[in-house]
């Protein structure tokens, strides 16, 4: 078996920043267990598998493909950064001729289109509802100790818990916050939570560039201790911060050690456009 495989850094214009994802091009269907084996071998937060939907399809000319995402531990229903990476590989390396690509996924049809300053993903917008603190107190205390919390919401569609830190904190605090992910699996084992979002209101005019909000994302439940930049989390964050800031256009920064920027535009049809750059840093052949 020989498969073309790439690694692309998503939500960045520069290599070695943003969130790396492996992208594998499938001419034919793979055995089910082989997807997971390859993802485990790549050992990145996600590996994307792009497959042809029809035998006559062509990676350079067709505009619609199947797309699946796997962490080293399991398949996931949505991954924004690996979708961006997949589009970058098709646009920039395979030289796909189309301006918009459609991916058929577990989360429905997702579209990626070329833009002057990167690639725009058309993603579902997921609401987050108020969450009772006492139900998740052990999880929050385990993760961040006595850090002051301003708001807690839960997204049932994505199984993500959103924890907004107090406005007394700044970006530097969030970047340096030590988060205990090792014990989260023990305190939350009901299956309700699959991801923890920590977020903070932005500082207009602060630190070289103004951002509307900051975040970090942790998902040990699917084998990812901390994800560098997370498109799917921003499908939840966009809904939350749009309501609290009264804005449809936002600029966000995810404060992982690699860091990544995301442009956000809420659409009239109830979806969200998330914009980012991507840099393809590796291409080769997987042999097994």
Swiss-Prot record:
The keyword Isomerase applies. Its EC number is 5.1.-.-. This is Phenazine biosynthesis-like domain-containing protein. InterPro entries: Phenazine_PhzF-like (IPR003719). It is an enzyme of class 5 (isomerase). NCBIfam families: PhzF_family (TIGR00654). SUPFAM superfamilies: Diaminopimelate epimerase-like. Belongs to the PhzF family.
